[in-house]
C-alpha cells in the first residue's frame, strides 16, 4: 500500500467520525468534553501505525492530517473560532503532525531498547579512538540506501531519529 492511499483512507475515516463531535455539540456538551471526543474518537484514527508510514508522507498529506483537527476545532468553537493556532492553544492541543513526529521518536527509542526489536539497528563501528575532544556522536550505523524511497523508509528514518538525539 502506498502512503498516499493509506493517508487518504485514514483522513476519510476521521472525517466520517466527525459527526460525533457535531452531534455532541448540538446536545450541549462542554468544550472540554468536545475536545476529548475529538481526540479520542476522531484524531485517534490518524495514529494507526504512524511510526511506519509517517516518515514517507508528503507535505500535502501532512496538511490533510492537520486539516482534520482544524475542522474539528472549528466545529467545537463555532463563531468563537479565531484561527487554528489560537484554537489549538485554547484546547491545549498540539498539531496532529507534531504529535505523530513525537510518537515516532518515542517508538524509535523504545524499539532500540527492546530485546525483540533492537536487531533493527546496527551498532556504530568504532572508526576512531574516543578522546576528550572527539566522541563518536552516532549510536547506530546509518542504513545505506541506493534509492531515495528506501532512504525514507521506516528503519533508516528511525535510525536517523535515534542518532540525532
Language model: regions and residue ranges:
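Non-catalytic, peripheral interaction segments enriched in hydrophobic/basic residues
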Residues: 1-112
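Charged boundary/loop elements
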Residues: 47-62, 66, 75-78, 82, ...
Amino acid at each position: 500500500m502506498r502512503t498516499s492511499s493509506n493517508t487518504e483512507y485514514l483522513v476519510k475515516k476521521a472525517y466520517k467520525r466527525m459527526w460525533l463531535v457535531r452531534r455532541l455539540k448540538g446536545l450541549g456538551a462542554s468544550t472540554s468534553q468536545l475536545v476529548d471526543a475529538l481526540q479520542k474518537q476522531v484524531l485517534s484514527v490518524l495514529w494507526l501505525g504512524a511510526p511506519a508510514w509517517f516518515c514517507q508522507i508528503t507535505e500535502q498529506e501532512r496538511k490533510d492530517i492537520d486539516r482534520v483537527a482544524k475542522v474539528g476545532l472549528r466545529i467545537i468553537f463555532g463563531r468563537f473560532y479565531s484561527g487554528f493556532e489560537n484554537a489549538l492553544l485554547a484546547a491545549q492541543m498540539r498539531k496532529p503532525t507534531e504529535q505523530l513526529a513525537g510518537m515516532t521518536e518515542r517508538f524509535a527509542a523504545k524499539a532500540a531498547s527492546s530485546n525483540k526489536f533492537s536487531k533493527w539497528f546496527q551498532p556504530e563501528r568504532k572508526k576512531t579512538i574516543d578522546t576528550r575532544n572527539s566522541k563518536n556522536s552516532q549510536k547506530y550505523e546509518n542504513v545505506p540506501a541506493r534509492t531515495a524511497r528506501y532512504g525514507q523508509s521506516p528503519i533508516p528514518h528511525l535510525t536517523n531519529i535515534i542518532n540525532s538525539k
